[in-house]
Amino acid sequence: FNGRGFDVPFLYLRSALLNVAITKKNWLGYRFATEPHCDLAEQFTFYGVSGREGAARRFNLDFYCKAFGIDSPKSQGVTGMDINSLLAEGRYRDIAEYCLRDVRATVELYRLWKTRLAGIK
């Protein structure tokens, strides 16, 4: 979720800062293709067609999870904003559990998108 807008650019820039070679440049692919990368944030906003207003405005993963009855990664009280403090406190298990909830929610949302929205022509 939001891989095109955050995850992939973050990984590229972080790799550059740490002098870690980027082994593949085109992880994102063509913007309007859903292979090899499907950015659910773009899919659920229909590529931002209505800008910041209207039915297709951009919401976060937590919003879509709640809207579609999927357990949100934030349901246990941890958010992405907590990661730095959890890391400083050595709470690696809490971080791992949050990441696992995030992956599970993203997979469930992807499956929902694939069955209910992906086939719209």
Label each PLM-derived region with a short phrase.
Residues 1-96, 101-104, 109, 113-114, ...:
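Metal-dependent phosphoesterase core characteristic of DEDDh/y 3'-5' exonuclease domains
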